[in-house]
A protein has these predicted regions:
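Hydrophobic, well-ordered secondary-structure elements that form the walls
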Residues: 16, 53, 130, 173, ...
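Solvent-exposed beta-hairpin/edge-strand motifs
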Residues: 327-343
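Active-site neighborhood of glycoside hydrolase catalytic domains
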Residues: 41-45, 49, 55, 79-237, ...
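Carbohydrate-binding surface patches
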Residues: 289-330, 367-371
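A cross-family glycoside hydrolase active-site/sugar-binding cleft signature
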Residues: 19, 61-65, 128-130, 174-176, ...
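Aromatic- and glycine-enriched glycan-recognition loops and surfaces
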Residues: 1-78, 83-84, 109-113, 152-162
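C-terminal beta-strand-rich structural cap/linker in extracellular carbohydrate-active enzymes
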Residues: 346-378
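Aromatic- and carboxylate-lined catalytic core of secreted/periplasmic carbohydrate-active enzymes
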Residues: 242-247, 251-288
């Protein structure tokens, strides 16, 4: 973790989240549930790492899956069935995990104690809450139907979240849910951030990123940016543009990429920080329509009263040029600048009469981020 922490700090990251596996030395999938650090993995303790994250000016975060216990979790073997979803008199499990029942106050108290320990002992300020099972139709225990048991569990879980945020108002909690599931506003009215996908091909992620504001607010839409050691500078730019108008989840082997790519990551994060104050008050628009995975060109815009921001991607095909309609700009003069990357040499031109921005991307898998200031009509 140390090399990644150092490079993340240099790039300008503000949080550093330790992902799954911190509680086990090896295979852990079916044994989760106690949420205690693995001394084999962290011989000097997890606190050594979280303290180091703090020393680099970042807030430490951690991965947690608070609604499940593995079937081989030692604690689960000692607990009564009232802690879990039950059907036909037996605990139900999916993918080798039991579903915890948050109607039970002991469950809520236990998971609150886990969060308390992570915050108070390790200084955790960010929790990536995952959820990787399908609990089925619900639980029959103490319910007239499985559906009633499910509904009351969900309500109890939301109340638990409310209590956490009341207790720790500065805590940031991400709704990961297996990479973009459970995107509903019962959840999103509480969670700080929503994962949009676990897509591992950054070229496809452009479509997910561009469409995400159709389902959730841009400032909650967490999008991965993960430049690869085998990539080039355009691949790094593509990654950064994917997340620029949303919520950047910076990832990738920042310790393995070239110095030029590191500089581009830092430049991208600096650019994002300079515009993120506008994101939560801007309205999204899709000048090329919603995106499909086989589209050659994709665009996402955010508009405020003062300016427009526009991310443009060329993914494939033999068409190096496109004119992007900006309806609110028709008949208006405009000042257009490429905000990212600073090395940009690809041409672009504003057409006042048509209200279009024409761009020329000389290769596939290119992306650019523009700022458009429309002049007020006389």
């Amino acid at each position: 973790e140390i090399p990644l922490i150092e490079e993340a700090a240099k790039a300008g990251c503000e949080y550093f989240c330790i992902d799954a596996g911190w509680y086990a030395k090896g295979f852990w999938w079916d044994a989760v549930g106690e949420w205690k650090e693995s001394r084999e993995r962290f011989p000097n303790g997890l606190k050594e790492v979280t303290d180091y994250i703090r020393s680099k000016g970042m807030i430490p975060g951690i991965w947690l899956e608070p609604e499940v216990m593995g079937i081989n979790c030692e604690l689960a073997k000692t607990l009564p069935d009232t802690w879990f979803f039950v059907r036909h008199g037996k605990r139900i499990y999916d993918r080798s995990r039991y579903q915890l029942d948050y109607r039970n106050p002991e469950v809520r108290e236990y998971m609150t104690s886990v969060v308390d320990r992570l915050i108070q002992e390790y200084g955790i300020g960010y929790i990536k809450m995952d959820y990787n099972i399908e609990p089925g139709i619900g639980t029959e225990y103490d319910a007239e139907s499985p559906g009633e048991g499910m509904l009351e569990h969900e309500r109890a879980y939301l109340q638990w979240l409310d209590a956490l945020f009341e207790k720790y108002p500065e805590l940031v909690i991400e709704n990961c849910s297996s990479g973009g599931l459970r995107i509903d506003y019962a959840m999103l009215s509480r969670y700080s951030i929503q994962s949009t996908s676990d897509e591992e091909d950054y070229r496809y992620y452009a479509t997910i990123a561009a469409n995400s504001p159709s389902g959730l607010t841009p400032e909650q839409s967490a999008v991965w940016s993960y430049p690869l050691p085998e990539g080039d500078r355009e691949a790094t730019v593509f990654n950064m543009v994917n997340a620029m108008l949303l919520r950047i989840h910076q990832s990738g082997r920042l310790d393995k990429i070239s110095e030029e790519e590191k500089d581009l990551v830092k430049e991208g994060l600096d650019c994002y920080k300079s515009i993120r104050g506008d994101i939560n008050k801007a309205l999204p628009f899709w000048p090329l329509g919603l995106s499909a995975f086989d589209d050659e060109w994709t665009a996402l815009g955010l508009g405020t009263e003062e300016k427009l921001y526009l991310s443009v991607w060329r993914r494939s095909g033999n068409t190096p040029c496109i004119s992007i309609p900006i309806p609110q700009g028709k008949g208006k003069e405009a000042e257009v600048i490429c905000r990212y990357p600073s090395f940009n040499t690809s041409t672009y031109e504003w057409n006042q009469v048509a209200g279009t921005l024409s761009v020329n991307f000389e290769r596939e898998n290119m992306a650019r981020f523009y700022e458009i200031k429309l002049c007020k009509e006389n």
